[in-house]
């Protein structure tokens, strides 16, 4: 089975690609260049050759959110997803599965929520996640769609925890990680 992955060079994408390849799947990374305006035909060819497409593309939220960077966060998620969905919807053969990332930032900042709550927050991140999911939902109704709402990635070798540990090592700033029972 061939699986195309946008965001394959990111932290989650690298680990997922390695895992899938270890299970014998043929992973096709969809690099940034494929999402340039003049590369749509090539993107379509890549998507056409796969049974599954996984969309993990998106600039890191672990930077200062200037207005320019907010636009980059938006473009790297919404524009990429829009192009992927367009490529999926123009396929000659139905795609089996489209998995598209989102984030728990979709929910309001306070309260307890799970995947059955349709209560979207009002801040920038919630609006971004909502727009991201709406783009993915424009996928043809005959394609199985899964939207995953990721939390903050915590790992010593990448993700947010690596940066937190670096700050703790080189400054007097300390981060206390809860036990998960808060």
Language-model features: locations:
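Active-site Tyr-X1-5-Lys
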Residues: 121-147
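NAD(P)-dependent short-chain dehydrogenase/reductase
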Residues: 130, 144-147, 151-182
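Active-site segment of SDR-like NAD(P)-dependent oxidoreductases
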Residues: 60, 102-106, 151-154, 171
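SDR active-site strand-loop-helix element
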Residues: 6, 53-57, 98-104, 148-150
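N-terminal Rossmann NAD(P)H-binding glycine-rich loop of SDR-like oxidoreductase domains
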Residues: 3-21
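NAD(P)H-binding glycine-rich loop region in Rossmannoid oxidoreductase-like domains
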Residues: 34-83, 87
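Rossmann-fold NAD(P)-dependent oxidoreductase module
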Residues: 15, 19, 87, 135
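Conserved Rossmann-fold NAD(P)-dependent oxidoreductase catalytic core, especially the SDR/UDP-sugar
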Residues: 82-123
């Amino acid at each position: 089975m061939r699986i195309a992955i946008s965001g394959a060079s990111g932290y989650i994408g690298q680990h997922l690609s390695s895992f899938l390849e270890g299970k014998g799947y043929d992973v096709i990374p969809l690099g940034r260049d494929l999402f340039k305006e003049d590369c749509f035909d090539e993107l379509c060819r890549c998507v056409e050759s796969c049974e599954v497409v996984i969309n993990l593309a998106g600039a890191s939220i672990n930077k200062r959110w200037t207005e320019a960077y907010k636009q980059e966060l938006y473009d790297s998620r919404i524009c990429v997803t829009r192009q992927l969905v367009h490529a999926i919807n123009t396929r000659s053969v139905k795609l089996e599965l489209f998995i598209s990332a989102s984030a728990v930032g979709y929910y309001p900042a306070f309260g307890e929520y799970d995947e059955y709550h349709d209560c979207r927050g009002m801040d920038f991140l919630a609006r971004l996640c909502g727009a991201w999911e709406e783009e993915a939902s424009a996928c043809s109704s005959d394609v199985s769609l899964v939207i995953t709402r990721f939390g903050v990635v915590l790992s010593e070798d990448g993700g947010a925890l690596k940066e937190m540990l670096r700050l703790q090592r080189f400054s007097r700033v300390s981060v206390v990680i809860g036990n998960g029972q808060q």
